[in-house]
Amino acid sequence: NPRGLPAFKHGNXVLNESYAXMYLESQFGSXGXLIPDADVIYYNWKVPEGERHD
């Protein structure tokens, strides 16, 4: 890691942290999902603040 970027290490594979979630999900997919696929994760970006429900 010459540039000092955050890294994730699993066995002999060293990954950038931005790819770690996708890597873990592909390796351990039977244990569940790490990346949500529902539209609720975009709620704060898609719904104007005045129209949001608490």
Swiss-Prot record:
Keyword set, alphabetical order: Cytoplasm, Transferase
Catalysis performed (reactions): RX + glutathione = an S-substituted glutathione + a halide anion + H(+)
UniProt GO cellular component terms: cytoplasm
Entry PTM: The N-terminus is blocked.
Main location: cytoplasm
Enzyme nomenclature, EC number: 2.5.1.18
MF (Gene Ontology): glutathione transferase activity
Localization of this protein: Cytoplasm
Similarity-based family: Belongs to the GST superfamily. Theta family.
Subunit (UniProt): Homodimer.
Primary role: Conjugation of reduced glutathione to a wide number of exogenous and endogenous hydrophobic electrophiles.
Full protein name: Glutathione S-transferase 6.7
Organism: Dicentrarchus labrax (European seabass)
